[in-house]
Amino acid sequence: MTLPMTTFITQRTQQTITINGERYTASGAKISASDGKSLLQKKFYDLYGKDSFYSSLADFLAEWFDDSNTLKVHTSGSTGQPKELWVEKRKMMNSAILTISFLKLHQGDSAMLCMPLQYIAGKMVVVRSLVAGLNLIPIPPCGHPMQNLETPPVFSAMIPMQVFNSLQVPSERKLLMQIQHLIIGGGAIDDALGKALQEFPHAVWSTYGMTETLSHIALRRLNGSDHSDWYTPFDNVSLSLSEENTLTIHAPSVCSELLRTNDIAEFNQHGQFRILGRKDNTINTGGVKVQIEQVEKELKSLLNCPFMITSVPDPKFGERIVLLIEAVHINHEQINESIKKLPPYWRPKQIIRIDTLPLTDTGKPSRAVARQIASNYIDKT
């Protein structure tokens, strides 16, 4: 997409948004100075209730159309406390244009919004709809976003848990497979889910990005003849590795500063990359550095229940690997047999049963909470 076309699209559609086939103008979404609410807020508050997902959409649009050039977003908090960031609306539109251009979305295409609006992923679905003139289909965030739909959207962004759940219900699976442009982010895609996606007739993509990059700056194809383990960055994104082999991102159209991530990565000869894990998810046990994500990937095929790997301090080894298992009862003998198949330094030294694994609001493993759960358990024993 050339710059003149980009400018044209932005100016043409930024002042209107289509929701469930009904067009709303910026003036209707903007807060009135007289009563502190927009016409859209009043309508959605009355129809759906002040605490509804539709009302949160009206609140976001009121913020989008206010006089400020920035708005506040929150990180997911997967590795610690969520952070507040102020981001430029102009750069959010730049991010939207990257995705619209890459996927070749067109005015009038439907876009399902099934992500929480307090985080960047949900906000960017709305911004893409504004910029490209998409028909936004709001679905309150849940584990089965397809369950009440009669026709599939043209475009949707989902987390792995939503995709997995939808695949388990035949009617939802049928609709899911008809989505023409499906992007999946917010968590790892395991081998079983990746295999199931191979049957999809349309392109399915895994995204790489974060709040600081205003959603994704790279995609990798999950199905078809072009499927790959490697992410391809957008054209205006420059990537490199730090001395610690963590990914450094230079993407001036969406992020003003050089971004140093905690993601340990490697490149291939084509400039594509893949993520090996996070620096803050490295466990140093007995002088050997173990990557949590790699242990979890190996255990996926060995354990048939939800689990997480975490660690606790250990006076002998520095850190001790701990396995958290979500189950009513656990078969220690069976689990120990599975653990023996791991390399020696990868093997958890302790197994803890819990009722529910800690997740963030966006469905990511809450690593900080997992460590706290393990530490509290150890302290009590």
Predicted regions and their residues:
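Gly/Ser/Thr-rich phosphate-binding loop
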Residues: 9, 169-224
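Conserved pre-ATP/AMP-binding loop-to-beta segment of ANL
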Residues: 55-74, 107-108
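Conserved AMP-binding A3 loop
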Residues: 69-97, 104
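AMP-binding/adenylate-forming
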Residues: 88-94, 110-165
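Conserved AMP-binding/adenylate-forming
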Residues: 195-204, 212-272, 279-282
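AMP-binding/adenylate-forming catalytic core of the ANL superfamily
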Residues: 264-346
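Conserved C-terminal "lid"/linker of ANL adenylate-forming enzymes
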Residues: 283, 310, 322-326, 337-381
